[in-house]
Amino acid sequence: MAPYSLLVTRLQKALGVRQYHVASVLCQRAKVAMSHFEPHEYIRYDLLEKNIDIVRKRLNRPLTLSEKIVYGHLDDPANQEIERGKTYLRLRPDRVAMQDATAQMAMLQFISSGLPKVAVPSTIHCDHLIEAQLGGEKDLRRAKDINQEVYNFLATAGAKYGVGFWRPGSGIIHQIILENYAYPGVLLIGTDSHTPNGGGLGGICIGVGGADAVDVMAGIPWELKCPKVIGVKLTGSLSGWTSPKDVILKVAGILTVKGGTGAIVEYHGPGVDSISCTGMATICNMGAEIGATTSVFPYNHRMKKYLSKTGRADIANLADEFKDHLVPDPGCHYDQVIEINLSELKPHINGPFTPDLAHPVAEVGSVAEKEGWPLDIRVGLIGSCTNSSYEDMGRSAAVAKQALAHGLKCKSQFTITPGSEQIRATIERDGYAQVLRDVGGIVLANACGPCIGQWDRKDIKKGEKNTIVTSYNRNFTGRNDANPETHAFVTSPEIVTALAIAGTLKFNPETDFLTGKDGKKFKLEAPDADELPRAEFDPGQDTYQHPPKDSSGQRVDVSPTSQRLQLLEPFDKWDGKDLEDLQILIKVKGKCTTDHISAAGPWLKFRGHLDNISNNLLIGAINIENRKANSVRNAVTQEFGPVPDTARYYKQHGIRWVVIGDENYGEGSSREHRALEPRHLGGRAIITKSFARIHETNLKKQGLLPLTFADPADYNKIHPVDKLTIQGLKDFAPGKPLKCIIKHPNGTQETILLNHTFNETQIEWFRAGSALNRMKELQQK
């Protein structure tokens, strides 16, 4: 042992590599399961180490943590071309997670593939289809009744194909992943844009569309454009009213909603140790709002503490042995560096209408007065996948206790969403839930609820101007309640609680006083709460369905008359010709998020039925021609009508069409319906100034052409009444622009260039009609 250990040490020094534990160099001494639910699926730190060593020798430089985990999962580390921001990496993720709104389409596609079982550990989580109305138990019962067909499909499909199934009421996908599946060094993909939440436990967890998930479940290497790495150095320490949420609210204000596009945000520095594991998850979760591929923190004692408290001390011990691979190398290079002194950071609140409009809480009241935003807060809402941990609930309860001690309750309506059944049961046991009820709160079901528009709001009418404050992640127009006049702000749960008690945006809990029931003034003290329960977590009800060992007799039925589920028909292949005389369905003015393209809320019930869900295509996008939403000119009849109706008219009459968009088109959710719908209704291309990462990939997967103006000013050359011809598809090649001929009604023409990011594999998707079609072609060879 000694001579070999010495040899390894000398070799590492010669290569400029940090010295590793002898145990990790030799072998993985003990097999440790990835989760309690999959006892025969093991963590492969030995393979991670081997791949990192291969890549390190090739690159001959220190590696960031992001690079270690990503490159450590390369399909072919010895030969993979690696260049940040340019090359496409072929990766082997460790697992897949899907929420119920996206799992329907993902499983329908997997069924279409003809494969018998998933190739990697996979889970389905029921959290998106539960509407908030009356409170937890009643809303859950109603959801089970309304969504019985969908839940039965997902449960039986999971059983048939080897996918774990978390029943409705189990909690929000990302909290369940953090509690059970995420671990340092994991590469996990999830069909939800807030999958990066797992970065709080040291994993690279990336939001993708369902077609990407199908690739991984089918055992096909997953492609990701080699990400750049943005370093955020944290110094100082959090204290007082400042919370982990304020870190990402500050970063969002710096980088904006697209500043992280194509990059992993990697937090490091001495300030990291002052943040709890669930606090790190909060920061990583909301990294989706800056367009980041994902975010990650280095493994530390806070993660070890969380792993141990959630029954995974064996994983923590193994991570300790391999810790050198779970932190960045000294001297590693970041493409951009931001430094934040946590000791100087103030509580923030971002909004309205965009998550990157950052304000210190101390200033938002005066800004609101100046801008004409409603000062009175109608509703305060805490929870969501971003902020529903035990610590979040504890800090909010600490604020509420102070108000109750002075005889006060919330002036605003107040709702609480526990992140999981485990969190719900534990805060009930420890008294937090009752304190939050006593101050005026309603505890909702363990689900997404109002955060994704599942909110049957009764206190206002549509079009009524009002303000809400949430601890959620997104505040796009109409996202939470479908009211475009709701001014939504995002902040930490404790600030939401304080503002709900005060009832106004003008209240600053750091400096302002409240008046108690006895008429005496008092100031709220900064909340203090345990990051983890002192006793063990209470798991609550058992909500997990294991896939059976033998599923040969399992049936998965989809009724041909169902309004909720629809088996998929393959999209048509490319006909080998250029796209001639495309009609412009809509030229979008300004921001066009995934909520504008295909809203959630009441439309979630159609996520498994492509034709029905297509009836909401682009109904939120603003038409530049008339400055209206869901009103576009039919080029044949010359009448204005809803976008989906016009698209269906074009499809019925054999008219192919295109969408023209602005900057960061498709920011927001990972749901691939935003790509499936335009493809289903006859769309062929989306041309914009720039795309959000996930949406661009989703469009490619479904055989559409996401293209960008070589000169962004060319956006202004195109008018809604023009026709477009896209040339160069016969010689379609990576890095080679396509030509676009703009044909104006007066007979004049202009030619512009359109860029794309297709690689060879993705071009094959286009030619086959979709990535799924291409998968079937390869299976038949």
Curated annotation (Swiss-Prot):
Name of the molecule in the record: Aconitate hydratase, mitochondrial
Transit peptide (first-last residue): 1-27
- The organism is Sus scrofa
Q: Where does [4Fe-4S] cluster bind?
A: C385, C448, C451
Does Phosphoprotein count among this protein's keywords?
A: yes
Subunit description: Monomer.
Name of the gene encoding the protein in the UniProt record: ACO2
Entry-annotated residues carrying Phosphoserine = S559, S670
Cofactor notes? Binds 1 [4Fe-4S] cluster per subunit. Binding of a [3Fe-4S] cluster leads to an inactive enzyme.
EC number(s) from the headed UniProt entry: 4.2.1.3
- Residues annotated as carrying Pyrrolidone carboxylic acid in the record are Q28
